[in-house]
């Protein structure tokens, strides 16, 4: 196990190095000049050149990349071009809404989708199964921003049950915090619920067809005991895999969701940085999101051995 973890951590470092290079190269080649945006419309060429020199944008690509990597190795993600604040500080100010939204969505999605998938597999071919699968197809089909606007029009504007936008810290109370996250979580988590439900159902159907499950049923074990104690436990690995992969859905969906619901999170910060070509923020956020995704999938891989004794590292 230890050797496997060390090997995976080493590969994670390589992946993050490649991601860092690709992100920096893509932003370097992206059309547009942040110096011209900072200088304004009435700036002269000399003003723009002066800003280039100040930001180091007049240096060769490898020199800029090397300087950025050196700062990154010391925990410095750079400084925002427009606010002149450290990127780590800006991300720290915005991290609570994003973490609250993604964690709440993840927990609710797992709590809803796994039972739906199990019930659909146990009642395969019935109206209940067809209803669950129809919901899954619908969940995949509706884009996040479309569902978000439908929820806003229905529950925030027409019924006036929930706030349209904004965020309240959990320090202000659980209910105010939750009220501002219900609609964003539904909009963000619907496609995630649909995905996990389909995978859970397919994995359960495969396990329920195995001989050892039929043997357990023939011994007279209770249906719930067969489903939970035998079938679900052995079907857990594919479900855990899709949960880890789905983190990418949550991260990308959070950017859209935070923009629609005006949540002051990292996703909203990223959109603002893209519109202003604030490259240090874009680079820092991309690296952090990539690291979270890689580490979550590493944790999922390591947890396989906990649910399936046949897996050894």
Predicted regions: what they are:
Residues 2-4, 13, 95-130, 144, ...:
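Alpha-helical transmembrane segments of integral membrane proteins
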Residues 15-66, 159-180:
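Hydrophobic alpha-helical transmembrane segments of membrane transport/permease proteins
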Residues 22-29, 59, 67-70, 134-165, ...:
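Membrane-water interface segments at the C-terminal ends of transmembrane alpha-helices
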Residues 36-38, 63, 78-81, 147-148, ...:
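Short, hydrophobic secondary-structure boundary micro-motifs
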Residues 58-114:
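An internal, D/E-rich "acidic patch" concept
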């Amino acid at each position: 196990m230890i050797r496997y973890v060390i090997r995976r951590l080493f590969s994670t470092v390589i992946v993050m190095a490649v991601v860092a290079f690709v992100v920096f190269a893509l932003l370097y080649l992206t059309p547009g000049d942040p110096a011209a945006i900072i200088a304004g419309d009435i700036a002269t060429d000399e003003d723009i050149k002066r800003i280039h020199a100040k930001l180091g944008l007049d240096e060769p690509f490898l020199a800029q990349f090397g300087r950025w990597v050196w700062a990154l190795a010391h925990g410095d993600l750079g400084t925002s071009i427009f606010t002149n604040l450290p990127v780590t500080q800006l991300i720290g100010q915005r991290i609570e809404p994003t973490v609250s939204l993604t964690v709440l969505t993840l927990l609710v999605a797992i709590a809803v989708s796994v039972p739906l998938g199990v019930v659909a597999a146990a009642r395969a071919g019935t109206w209940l199964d067809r209803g669950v699968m129809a919901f899954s197809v619908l969940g995949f089909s509706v884009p996040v921003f479309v569902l978000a606007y439908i929820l806003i029009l229905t529950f925030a504007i027409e019924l006036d049950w929930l706030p349209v936008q904004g965020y309240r810290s959990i320090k202000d109370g659980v209910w105010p915090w939750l009220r501002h996250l219900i609609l964003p979580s539904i909009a963000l988590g619907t496609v995630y619920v649909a995905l996990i439900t389909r995978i859970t159902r397919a994995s359960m159907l495969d396990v329920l067809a195995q001989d050892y499950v039929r043997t357990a049923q023939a011994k007279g074990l209770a249906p719930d005991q067969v489903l939970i104690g035998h079938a679900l436990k052995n079907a857990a690995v594919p479900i855990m895999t899709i949960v880890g992969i789905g983190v990418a859905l949550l991260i990308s969906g959070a950017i859209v969701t935070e923009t629609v619901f005006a949540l002051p999170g990292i996703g909203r910060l990223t959109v603002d940085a893209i519109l202003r070509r604030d490259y240090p923020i874009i680079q820092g956020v991309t690296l952090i999101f990539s690291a979270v995704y890689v580490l979550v999938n590493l944790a999922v891989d390591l947890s396989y051995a906990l649910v399936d004794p046949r897996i050894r590292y």
